[in-house]
Regions:
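Polar/acidic, low-complexity leader/linker segments enriched in S/T/G and N/D
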Residues: 1-42
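Short polybasic amphipathic segments
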Residues: 2-9, 94-96, 206-209, 239-244
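Short, acidic/charged, Gly/Pro-enriched secondary-structure junctions
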Residues: 6, 66-114, 271-273
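Short, solvent-exposed beta-alpha or beta-beta edge segments that form flexible loop/patches at the rim
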Residues: 27-64
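Oligomerization/assembly interface segments of phage tail-like spikes and tubes
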Residues: 50-72, 122-136, 270
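Short beta-strand and beta-hairpin "edge-sheet" elements
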Residues: 95-140
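Short, charged, solvent-exposed linker or helix-capping segments at domain edges/interfaces
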Residues: 139-147
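Intrinsically disordered, low-complexity segments enriched in serine, threonine, and glycine
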Residues: 146-300
Length: 300
């Protein structure tokens, strides 16, 4: 059973918390997450026994949320219903947060209120929201971040400057990670896209990220200056390449290498290697992604 959720309008940012215990104005009744159905794509030959399944696609999800409006008089009830009426609009998407996960849906209708006086009066009113999820998967609220190449800060206080420093040569203010290969774990149920960030600490050219297992890669054929940042988004429906230099953001799609693939994170462990045509030591690489799950419901 789900004991509490938070709803947030994607368009306005307005929030509505529904809980079985702690919310005095709007109380959660129940949440039905529905289920993700699948379609098996198959074909067969003459006289073949059974069929050959070429692939399976996941379909959409339908959800249903019921709750209660609590008030002390008719005026208060009217005002609280108005809040619900403004919040749920079939033209605006809603994010529903549950524990550490979020699911986006579009309301199928405006708010449905109970038609019986026992469940719809000046002190209590039962309501229901039904929604359609084009993307049926739950994703984590917080993006996972992996640093493929970065500078580890070493400077700290108290600062003691010795006349005979160890190691000789002065004080280390930052240490670059020596490995060119990074492991990224996708603990979700499906392959997901990611956001790749190339950041230049000095001049370099041709930054790239390569999947060690498949040898697929993404490369940007451009010389980078110190402080320049390139963001590549490989999420389906959100693919883009943007660059920022001196506070100005531009479209870098024209710099994409023709052989580049929109890299995805497979379920399980993924090994990636970063590189550059010149001065790879000046390159910092970060990868952001969200694990996605079919179902996430816990005990409460």
């Amino acid at each position: 059973m789900v004991e509490g959720i938070k709803l947030q309008s994607v368009d306005t940012g307005a929030t509505l918390v529904l809980d079985m215990v702690s919310t005095p104005d709007y109380i959660l009744g129940s949440v039905d997450w529905g289920a993700v159905e699948s379609t098996h794509h198959s074909f067969k030959y003459v006289n073949q026994i059974g069929v050959y399944v070429a692939g399976t696609s996941l379909e959409t999800r339908s959800i249903s949320i019921t709750g209660w409006v609590i008030a002390e008089n008719e005026t208060m009830m009217t005002n609280r219903k108005r809040v619900l009426n403004r919040f749920f609009n079939p033209q605006g998407a809603i994010d529903v947060f549950y524990k550490n996960y979020v699911l986006r849906f579009l309301p199928n209708t405006s708010v449905k209120y109970s038609a019986t006086i026992a469940d719809n009066n000046e002190v209590v009113c039962k309501f229901k929201i039904e929604g359609y999820c084009p993307d049926p998967l739950f994703k984590e609220k917080t993006e996972s971040k992996v640093a493929a190449a970065r500078i580890v800060p070493m400077f700290h206080f108290p600062l003691v400057i010795s006349k005979t420093p160890k190691p000789p040569g002065g004080i280390i203010f930052g240490l670059r990670q020596p490995s060119l290969i990074v492991a990224i774990n996708n603990s979700g149920a499906v392959d997901v896209g990611m956001k790749i960030i190339f950041r230049a600490n000095g001049t370099l050219s041709g930054p790239s990220l390569i999947n060690v297992n498949t040898q697929k890669y993404f490369k940007v054929n451009k010389s980078m200056q110190a402080g320049e940042e390139i963001v590549i988004d490989t999420i389906i429906g959100e693919k883009k390449i943007q660059g920022t230099l001196n506070g100005v953001t531009s479209n870098y799609f024209k710099y994409r290498d023709l052989g580049s693939e929109w890299l995805q994170l497979s379920v399980g462990d993924n090994l990636f290697r970063y590189d550059a045509d010149q001065n790879a030591e000046n390159l910092e690489v970060y990868v952001y992604y969200n694990n996605k799950y079919l179902e996430v419901q816990e005990c409460y």
